[in-house]
């Protein structure tokens, strides 16, 4: 299986609830290497760029308001099959449907506060990594 890179973000409620360490531990225990990591607070412009594909959806403004409500932890992960593997480890978007043992199944409280984001495709991973990290930050 090819080594890939993907983008992931611990959302504001994950930071607020003190889950950063537990989530990072799960990612590393899975064998994923953290290539780059930073804590930041998204501006509305950064959030709009991140959620550009949802711009015309009725929930768009709620996404923007939520993701800018507090600091996030943005990261780049690397490993064989990391894009699909991270999606499995995160669990279903709706925490009520997420299996126990997944990050959302164990930590998320509701769909709007589902603790973690992960790129859903190689193209999304590339786009999102470029939004948050410079080539120099990626080593």
Swiss-Prot record:
Reactions this protein catalyses: a 2'-deoxyribonucleoside 5'-diphosphate + ATP = a 2'-deoxyribonucleoside 5'-triphosphate + ADP; a ribonucleoside 5'-diphosphate + ATP = a ribonucleoside 5'-triphosphate + ADP
Top-level EC class as recorded in UniProt: transferase
GO biological process: CTP biosynthetic process; GTP biosynthetic process; UTP biosynthetic process
Keyword Manganese: no
Entry keyword annotation includes NADP: no
Oligomer status and interactors: Homotetramer.
PANTHER family found in the cross-reference section: NUCLEOSIDE DIPHOSPHATE KINASE
Name by which UniProt lists this protein: Nucleoside diphosphate kinase
Lineage of origin: Bacteria, Bacillati, Bacillota, Clostridia, Moorellales
């Amino acid at each position: 299986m090819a080594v890939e890179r993907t983008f992931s973000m611990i959302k504001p409620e994950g930071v607020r609830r003190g889950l950063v360490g537990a989530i990072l531990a799960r990612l590393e225990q899975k064998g994923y290497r953290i290539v780059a990591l930073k804590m930041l607070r998204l501006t509305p412009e950064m959030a709009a760029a991140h959620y550009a594909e949802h711009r015309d959806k009725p929930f768009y403004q709620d996404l923007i308001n939520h993701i800018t409500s507090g600091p996030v932890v943005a990261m780049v992960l690397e490993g064989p099959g990391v894009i699909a593997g991270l999606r499995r480890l995160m669990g279903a978007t709706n925490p009520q449907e997420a299996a126990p043992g997944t990050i959302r199944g164990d930590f998320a409280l509701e769909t709007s506060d589902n603790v973690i984001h992960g790129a859903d495709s190689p193209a999304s991973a590339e786009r999102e990594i470029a939004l948050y990290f410079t080539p120099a930050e990626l080593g």
